[in-house]
Regions:
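Conserved helicase/translocase motor-coupling segment
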Residues: 1-49, 55
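A cross-kingdom feature that marks ATP-driven nucleic-acid transaction machinery
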Residues: 45-53, 57-176
Length: 176
C-alpha cells in the first residue's frame, strides 16, 4: 500500500488519534481528511499492522441481537496520541474536554499490550446495543465474560446496570 500524500496521511493520523476510543466511522474520517473511504481503510490497516492502532471488535452472540457491529479504534501509544492531538501538557490531558477518552485509551492500550507481552491475542471486546447500553471492555476468559467500565472520576455511575444485558437473569455473570 502506497501513501501518495504525507500531508493527507498526517491529517488521517490526527483524525484517528482524536477519535481514539470511539466507534470507527470510515466515512466521517474520509470526509475530514479529504480522501476516499477505501484509502482510509487501507491506511487503518497500515496502522494496525504497525501496532499503532487496535480495532476493538464488538461482542455479540445469538442472545445479543441488538449489538452494533462497528469496531472502536484505539491508539496504542498515548504519547503519540497526545502529540498528534496537541494535548501536550499533563494539565491539558487531565482537565481537557477529552480527558475521559484519553484515560480510556490508555487503560485499553495497556490491557492490550499486557496480553501481547504474554504472547496472547487479546480476548477483548466492547458492547453497545441499539438502546445505547454500553460496556467499555469485556475480557473473555475460560468461557466467562468480565465486564469493565472505565471512568476518570471519583464518582462513577452505576455501570453494572449495563452489565445485565449480557445474560438472562437466571445465568448472570459476576461483575467486579
Amino acid at each position: 500500500t502506497q501513501i501518495n500524500s504525507i500531508s493527507d496521511f498526517t491529517r488521517f493520523m490526527v483524525a484517528i488519534a482524536a477519535r481514539s476510543g470511539e466507534l470507527l466511522n470510515y466515512s466521517s474520517v474520509a470526509q475530514d481528511v479529504g480522501v476516499s473511504i477505501d484509502t482510509i481503510k487501507r491506511w487503518t490497516g497500515i496502522l494496525q499492522t504497525s501496532g499503532i492502532v487496535y480495532l476493538l471488535q464488538p461482542y455479540s452472540n445469538n442472545h445479543l441481537k441488538r449489538a452494533i457491529k462497528t469496531p472502536k479504534s484505539y491508539m496504542l501509544d498515548t504519547g503519540l496520541m497526545a502529540w498528534l492531538t496537541k494535548w501536550l501538557t499533563p494539565e491539558t490531558i487531565q482537565q481537557g474536554a477529552k480527558n475521559g477518552q484519553f484515560f480510556e485509551s490508555f487503560v485499553v492500550s495497556e490491557i492490550i499490550k499486557s496480553f501481547y507481552n504474554h504472547g496472547m491475542e487479546p480476548p477483548i471486546y466492547f458492547y453497545r446495543d441499539t438502546n445505547q447500553k454500553e460496556i467499555d471492555l469485556l475480557i473473555e476468559r475460560d468461557g466467562r465474560l468480565y465486564p469493565m467500565e472505565i471512568k476518570l472520576n471519583d464518582k462513577p455511575s452505576h455501570a453494572q446496570k449495563n452489565f445485565l444485558v449480557l445474560a438472562p437473569e437466571e445465568s448472570r455473570i459476576p461483575y467486579y
